[in-house]
UniProtKB/Swiss-Prot annotation, chain B:
Disruption phenotype: RNAi-mediated knockdown results in mild defecation defects. RNAi-mediated knockdown increases the levels of unprenylated rab-27. RNAi-mediated knockdown disrupts the localization of rab-5 and rab-7. Expressed in several neurons including head neurons, motor neurons located in the ventral nerve cord, HSN and CAN neurons, and tail neurons, and in muscles such as body-wall, pharyngeal, intestinal and anal sphincter. Also expressed in seam cells, the hypodermis and the intestine. Keywords: Cytoplasm, GTPase activation. The gene is rep-1. Pfam families: GDI. One of its GO terms (cellular component) is Rab-protein geranylgeranyltransferase complex. Its main location: cytoplasm. Substrate-binding subunit of the Rab geranylgeranyltransferase (GGTase) complex. Binds unprenylated Rab proteins and presents the substrate peptide to the catalytic component B and remains bound to it after the geranylgeranyl transfer reaction. The component A is thought to be regenerated by transferring its prenylated Rab back to the donor membrane. Plays a role in neurotransmitter release from presynaptic terminals at neuromuscular junctions. Positively regulates the function of rab-27 in synaptic transmission most likely through mediating rab-27 prenylation. Changing residue 107 to K: In ta208; embryonic lethality in some animals and reduces brood size. Some animals have abnormal germ-line development and gonad morphology. May interact with rab-5, rab-7 and rab-11. Does not interact with rab-3, rab-27 and rab-10. This is Rab proteins geranylgeranyltransferase component A 1. It comes from the Eukaryota. Belongs to the Rab GDI family.
Amino acid sequence: MAKTYDYLFKLLLIGDSGVGKTCVLFRFSDDSFNNSFISTIGIDFKIRTIELDGKKIKLQIWDTAGQERFRTITTAYYRGAMGIILVYDITNERSFENIKNWIRNIEEHAASDVERMIIGNKCDIEERREVSRDRGEQLAIEYGTKFLETSAKANLNIDEAFFTLARDIKSKMEQNEMRAGGSVSNTGRVNVGGSGTQKKSFFSNWSCNLL
Amino acid sequence: MDEKLPESVDVVVLGTGLPEAILASACARAGLSVLHLDRNEYYGGDWSSFTMSMVHEVTENQVKKLDSSEISKLSELLTENEQLIELGNREIVENIEMTWIPRGKDEEKPMKTQLEEASQMRRFSIDLVPKILLSKGAMVQTLCDSQVSHYAEFKLVNRQLCPTETPEAGITLNPVPCSKGEIFQSNALSILEKRALMKFITFCTQWSTKDTEEGRKLLAEHADRPFSEFLEQMGVGKTLQSFIINTIGILQQRPTAMTGMLASCQFMDSVGHFGPSPFLFPLYGCGELSQCFCRLAAVFGSLYCLGRPVQAIVKKDGKITAVIANGDRVNCRYIVMSPRFVPETVPASSTLKIERIVYATDKSIKEAEKEQLTLLNLASLRPDAAVSRLVEVGFEACTAPKGHFLVHATGTQEGETSVKTIAEKIFEKNEVEPYWKMSFTANSMKFDTAGAENVVVAPPVDANLHYASVVEECRQLFCTTWPELDFLPRAMKKEEEEEEEPETEEIAEN
């Protein structure tokens, strides 16, 4: 069966509880928004395929499953992530300050070459702003990441954020591919969930052979 | 920590080791409200994997006993007729010793410094309980049904070695062929032996379709006699006998004809499922699996809180009514706890001591062109012991920096020769010089009860090669405690995922 995409990127959303990670995710994947705050239950990851420079890119975006509430994100969450969006809430100073802690977490557990981006969410609520745009930009410069202010509710800059991150990952990947001489080797990992990997059993092999 | 713990939940789970994680995910999946607590700042408890820079934490989980003023303070949280019971902190992992071994070739710069300077320390994933998965075993089935398989990746254990020892040559490590192709290419067997092996495999194929009773009948008087006698009678020569017994021996020590046949069928059933080898190893180490089940639990609403001093439980009329953590009272209907937490007043029904040594090396015990993930059954060198094996994992399984390996020795303590002695003999023979080692004793403690009817004690760490018994015990505990609920039932596929399904397969194949 033909592949329906050229690249698959695993992306993560990280940030304090209540900054709107799940809303950002839903806005991007389903173009929907729900105002009521419910701690994340039952959201694992969402998928949206986008097109960049004629290439189809499947984005698999993982939510924290609420494990950020007591800073108990599993280290396993970071495995294989190619891009991470750090989210804070512009109406919550604390969530902005904590971005530093989250970055430390990423440096400890994620791949060292993971692409990062900082977004200040809820920028539609100007009257309750606690963190100026300027400070957000400064922080991003400090960590050498891109920066956007977004609103999942007003649908501001959400697509831009994901497209920017995806573009950065894509160009890095293409550079690496060129350096590796056209193909990035795969190390033969097994995904036990995908039925496609399953081969015939030993028995069926043998009986075939014996017949 | 700005958030408070909930006042009341259906189930409090204490400890984030694999069995507790499986049980927490099963509870959350079944719709129970779950609070999952751990005293450590990390996941996995006594089943955890550590980086080289964090591994010292394994020695740091001391818990102070409550003094009388603390007890009287906590007692203020009790109501009438309630009794405070202090939770235990059993020594599941004890006698821990860790050393960097100075080596001549690192004279200029010790390996520790080399690794630190190249920031490679965090590339290690050092398992406390290294195990493998049978491709068609209970764990793989549970991972697939629950879709925890989304969170983990695996590598095939692509080399099985079987040692032989002679006074002249010392210990030689012989590759054991698993698949049909490997058998035909192997030089270790003659044409005649290969033919005998084919005959044996054909017999297994037929035997595997029979039920237990009929299978037993086919083995006739040999059923409970040693497997070797039965193989002899099938016309299998001595070399091939030891070959077969060594290969399946990793699943079944000292097999009788009956248990040997069962193990052979189990082995062959898993061969070819994901590749030539029947065994899988989790990428980033076995500690990942606990975390993956915790994520499933979290996706279904379980609340996670690590690094909390979990101090006591509250008992009333023979039942536990609450847990006290960090001075907060959380009411609950059930408690699931790892053996570590069982109150000191409750005696263990049995304790098995497991000897564990982990070595870090920069050379494989048997060098090959490509890096291999190796399983080595030491049973023939320690015939008295129930368990003795080595597992060598490296960069490909994301458990060590490139060019480095971890060698895990696991053994029960019967007999005169320790697994340590044998492992070190093998190193010497193959000119492998470990630069780091950690040794400890793991106590596999079983409890029939934890002193109250609504407390479930999770299965202990064990020395089994694979996960079937852990998964099975968790299932049984869950089904006995909550007979009306399903244990990790097959997940309903969302529409979106169905669309995606063929693509996922593509990824796996590429």
